[in-house]
Amino acid sequence: MFLARALHAVVLLSTVADGAAMKIPRSSSGAQKLTYSHYGPVPGESPLYSTYRGKTPPFPANITDPILPTRKGKPGVDDMVWQNLLSAEWAIFSFYQQGVETFNKTSFVEAGYPNTTYDRIQEIRDNEAGHLRIFQDQISDTSLKPGACKYQYPFNDPESFLVLSTFIEIASMTFLTGLVQMAKLPTSQGAMTAIAAVETRHEVWSLMDIWNVNPFSGPSDTVFPYANQILDLTNVSS
């Protein structure tokens, strides 16, 4: 519960519509194009999700509306897990995107951090954009694919941003390993494990390059068994 409360303190969600609007998701023609898995750059095939450098959000984060179901039928076996994860990923991506927009290379150098820090933050932002696309594709066409909310984060300088970044990466790894236990399909479990490995790399970079601490903490990381307690905090309509 401490982890859940702490993440709630990090991610302060503001309402983006009145109650009636929250019950009736609004989409757009641009968002509905995301139904097709090969629309736009494909994770694993496009370098966009590692090498993009720019202040504006990369695809698919430049399209923030929810994706409405395109056919009727029962939801996929793991749709709810992926929906919760996609909601959380929007919050995580938005954190890094705000960092990219707020700071620049000089901001971190003048604060005493390595001159590669801003570039690495952009790369992590790109990775998180790729996660958005992966999670969208994992949700079946019979289920809603969540869009973004508006997010506020308690950082006001490079140091407070990096502190929050480290915590978010630790929390991400923890609830992802917990979600693996909730997924029923082996393909879902494998995809979540692969994403958790990427989040761990982000965490290790932060611990070693930013804080100069030993990233080795034992033979196993923490598995948070109630991952939805964390993810539910990212759902503004709950």
Which residue ranges define each predicted feature?
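All-alpha RGS (Regulator of G-protein Signaling) helical domain and cognate RGS-like helical scaffolds
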Residues: 22-238
